């Protein structure tokens, strides 16, 4: 089903194969991670509450603390963990690593790698930092003005307005 349903906090895809998480985290006012877990469990039939609780502990996040008191990086971590635990095939991410310290960036990258190895999972990551994603992505494309500009290897050294000319004997 390609029809989208919109609620106040997330776009929900009825086919349950995709989970979006935007650049800015969207949580209920005064929500805790536990409350968001319970909400996601209702929306996503395959949501793994036990795994979410384990990951919260692994990432050192207090499940009963109000998310609004978290730092930007901690909010991003909760968003990633919620997305992972939906067990959807695709996780649509916007600026996934923005706000994360280097240790947490590596932890999230490792979590993505583990998910990719253990189940059918594809994170689709939008980022302004190629360096941040080049070590974990199989394919990278550059978007510009609503279209695909190309892949980084083909665009290196190319300036806007320049042409590639091939001449031969």
Range-by-range predicted roles:
Residues 102-104:
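Helix N-cap at the start of a conserved alpha-helix in ABC-type nucleotide-binding domains
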């Amino acid at each position: 089903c390609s029809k989208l349903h919109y609620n106040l906090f997330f776009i929900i895809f009825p086919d349950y194969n995709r989970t979006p998480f935007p650049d800015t985290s969207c949580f209920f006012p005064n929500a805790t991670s536990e409350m968001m877990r319970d909400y996601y469990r209702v929306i996503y039939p395959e949501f793994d509450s036990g795994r979410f609780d384990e990951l919260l502990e692994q990432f050192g996040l207090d499940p009963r603390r109000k998310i609004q008191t978290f730092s930007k990086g901690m909010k991003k971590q909760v968003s990633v963990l919620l997305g992972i635990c939906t067990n959807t095939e695709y996780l649509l991410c916007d600026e996934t690593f923005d706000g994360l310290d280097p240790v947490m960036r590596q932890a999230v990258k490792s979590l993505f790698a583990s998910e990719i190895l253990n189940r059918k999972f594809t994170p689709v990551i939008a980022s302004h930092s190629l360096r941040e994603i080049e070590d974990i992505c199989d394919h990278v494309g550059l978007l510009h003005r609503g279209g695909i500009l190309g892949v980084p290897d083909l665009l290196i050294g190319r300036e806007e307005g320049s042409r590639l000319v091939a001449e031969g004997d």
